[in-house]
Amino acid sequence: MGVRQQLALLLLLLLLLWGLGQPVWPVAVALTLRWLLGDPTCCVLLGLAMLARPWLGPWVPHGLSLAAAALALTLLPARLPPGLRWLPADVIFLAKILHLGLKIRGCLSRQPPDTFVDAFERRARAQPGRALLVWTGPGAGSVTFGELDARACQAAWALKAELGDPASLCAGEPTALLVLASQAVPALCMWLGLAKLGCPTAWINPHGRGMPLAHSVLSSGARVLVVDPDLRESLEEILPKLQAENIRCFYLSHTSPTPGVGALGAALDAAPSHPVPADLRAGITWRSPALFIYTSGTTGLPKPAILTHERVLQMSKMLSLSGATADDVVYTVLPLYHVMGLVVGILGCLDLGATCVLAPKFSTSCFWDDCRQHGVTVILYVGELLRYLCNIPQQPEDRTHTVRLAMGNGLRADVWETFQQRFGPIRIWEVYGSTEGNMGLVNYVGRCGALGKMSCLLRMLSPFELVQFDMEAAEPVRDNQGFCIPVGLGEPGLLLTKVVSQQPFVGYRGPRELSERKLVRNVRQSGDVYYNTGDVLAMDREGFLYFRDRLGDTFRWKGENVSTHEVEGVLSQVDFLQQVNVYGVCVPGCEGKVGMAAVQLAPGQTFDGEKLYQHVRAWLPAYATPHFIRIQDAMEVTSTFKLMKTRLVREGFNVGIVVDPLFVLDNRAQSFRPLTAEMYQAVCEGTWRL
C-alpha cells in the first residue's frame, strides 16, 4: 500500500472518530511517539498506559480512540515520510506566497492601480534623503530616493513634451520606449519616467550588434529608441533600418553627432520635477505589460518577453521573501537588461527601501573590496560569479565582510560548499525561473545543490510535471494514448509547468506563434496546456529539485543565454563557410557550456582563422562567441532535415575522439588556431583562458 493510500485511510479513520464524538489526539500522539522514539519504545509506553488505566481514570481516552491509535500504527510507515519534516517550512513559505499574491492582486485592482511606480513614490516621500543607488568604479557616486524620483519626473515631463500625449504614445498595442544603455542611472530615470506615464519599456542588451540588434528593436513594436552616446557606433550600423520603420532615435546627451538622431539632454534639464499624476496610469491592470526583457529562448533570435505589472511586483518581492529588510545593502554586478539585475535587484530595493550598490562590471579583485567599503549585506549572483570568487587565491581577509545573504541562480553544489567554507556561513537563497516562464522555484530551506523545493501544498498552487523526453527532438515522449509519460523520483525529466489562471503564460510580444511554440498540449489529459521550460530536472523524495540539463537550441555561458540560431546567422555571413551548426559543450571546471561550431566549408574555399576571428569579434558579444570550430565534410541531418547535435555535443572538442580538424579561439594570436593535444590538456586543466 502506497503512502497516499495509507494517508487516505488514516484521514477516514480520523473522520470516523470525529463523527462518533471521540477525541482524535491519541492517534496523533501514537504516531508521534512511533516516529520519534521507534517501535519498541512506543509499544512499551502504550502497554504501560493500558496497565495503568484503572488508576488514570477519566484521563484515559475511550476504547475506540485507543483502538484507532493502534490501527493507525499499523497503517502508516514506521519512519517519518521523507518530506514531512519540512512541513513547517513548507506551510510558512506557502503562507508568504499566498499573502504576497493576494496583496499584489489587491494593489493592482485599485483605481488608479497601485503599481511598482506608486510604491517607489511612497518610499521617495518617506525617506527622500536615503541613498538608493551607489555606483562604483570610474565616476563613482550615489543618488537618493528623492533625487531619483525628481529625475524620473523630469524624464516623464520631457518625454511627454517631446513625444506627445502618453495615451497616443501607448495607443493600440503596448508601445515601448527602448533603452539601449551602458550607463545605469540615466537609463533608470528614463525607465521610471515612462512608467510614471503608464508606458512599458524594453531593455536591450548593449552588446548586440548588427542584425540581432536591429531585430531586437523592430520586434518590440516601439516607436522610440533612447541610446547612450557611447553606443553611437552600434546605433549607426542599424539606423537606416530604423528610419525606414519610422522609429525615432535619441541620445541621452545634450548634442547629437549623428544626423537624424535627436538629443534629450536639454529637454531633461529644462523639464519640471513636480509629481506626475497617478491618473495617467489609470488604464493599467494586472495584465498590462510593464517591461519587455529580451530572452534568447530556444527558437531563434532574441524575443521580447512580456512582464506584466503583476509579474514585476511578484519578482520585486523576492528580496523581501528572502528575509532582506530596509536596513540591508544589496550589491549587484548583474546587467540591467536581465531580470535578476533590474527587477530583483533595483526594483527589490525600491520596494524595500534598501540601498543598492551597482558595479559597472564583475571584477574578482574589486568584489570583496566593494562589499567591505559599502557595508554590503546581500549579494546577487549567477552560478558562474561565485565560482570565479572561489577560484581567486585565498586571502587572510576572506571572511572580513558583512555579507549574510546571497541570492541568485545556477549555483553548483561543489561551488556552494566551497563558497560557504571559504567566505563564511553566508545563507544561500537559490531561485529558479525563466523570464517568460509562468512558474518559479525557490530553495527556501537552503539544501545544498538544489535549485528549488516543491511541497505537495505548493504543487497544488503551481502544478507541474517532469516527463520523459527525446533529446534529439527536444520534445516530450508520449504514450499510446498521446499523453506525456511522467518520470519517477530521482529520474531526469523535462519540466513542464501547467498554464492555469493563477499561473498564466503571457509569452512574447509579436506573432502569437512565437509564444505557441513554447506550449505543450494534452500532457496529462485532453485539453490541458503546459509551458515547456526546456530544462531537465530531477526531484528527490523530499521534494527538492536539481538541474540536470538544458534542451533546445540555447545554452548558457558566463551567466548569459546563447541562442545557437543567432550565432549560426552571424557565422553564415562568412564567405568561406557553407553550413554552420552551433551547440554548447561542457568544459571541466566551468559552469554552463561554451560555444562550439561544426562547419562545412564552401566548395573551393579554405579555412581562414584570422578572418573568422575578426568577424565574430565584430558581430558577436564575447559570451556568444564560439571558442571551438570543427570542420566537417558533410553535416548530419534528421529525416526532417534538421541538423543533428547529439553526437557533436557528446564528442565535444576531445582531440582523442574527434577525427575532424579542430580549431580553438586564441585571443593572443587573434585567430582560430589548430587545436593540439597540449592545448586540449590546457583547456581541461583550466590554464587556457576561455
Swiss-Prot record:
EC class: ligase
Enzyme Commission number: 6.2.1.7, 6.2.1.3, 6.2.1.-
Catalytic reactions on record: a fatty acid(in) = a fatty acid(out); cholate + ATP + CoA = choloyl-CoA + AMP + diphosphate; chenodeoxycholate + ATP + CoA = chenodeoxycholoyl-CoA + AMP + diphosphate; deoxycholate + ATP + CoA = deoxycholoyl-CoA + AMP + diphosphate
Cytoplasmic side: 1-30, 77-690
Record's bilayer topology term: Multi-pass membrane protein
One family name in Pfam for this protein: AMP-binding
Compartment(s) where it occurs, according to its Swiss-Prot or TrEMBL record: Endoplasmic reticulum membrane; Microsome; Cell membrane
Main location class: endoplasmic reticulum
Transmembrane segments: 31-51, 56-76
UniProt note on regulation of activity: 3-alpha,7-alpha,12-alpha-trihydroxy-5-beta-cholestanate (THCA) inhibits the activation of cholate.
Tissues of expression: Predominantly expressed in liver.
Keywords for the protein's UniProt record, in alphabetical order: ATP-binding, Cell membrane, Endoplasmic reticulum, Fatty acid metabolism, Ligase, Lipid metabolism, Lipid transport, Membrane, Microsome, Nucleotide-binding, Oxidoreductase, Phosphoprotein, Transmembrane, Transmembrane helix, Transport
Molecular function terms from GO: ATP binding; cholate-CoA ligase activity; long-chain fatty acid transmembrane transporter activity; long-chain fatty acid-CoA ligase activity; oxidoreductase activity; protein-containing complex binding; very long-chain fatty acid-CoA ligase activity
Gene3D superfamilies linked: 3.30.300.30, N-terminal domain of ligase-like
Summary of the function given for this chain in its UniProt record: May mediate the import of long-chain fatty acids (LCFA) by facilitating their transport across cell membranes. Also catalyzes the ATP-dependent formation of fatty acyl-CoA using LCFA and very-long-chain fatty acids (VLCFA) as substrates. Mainly functions as a bile acyl-CoA synthetase catalyzing the activation of bile acids via ATP-dependent formation of bile acid CoA thioesters which is necessary for their subsequent conjugation with glycine or taurine.
Protein family according to the UniProt entry: Belongs to the ATP-dependent AMP-binding enzyme family.
Protein name: Long-chain fatty acid transport protein 5
Source organism per UniProt: Homo sapiens (Human)
Encoding gene (name): SLC27A5
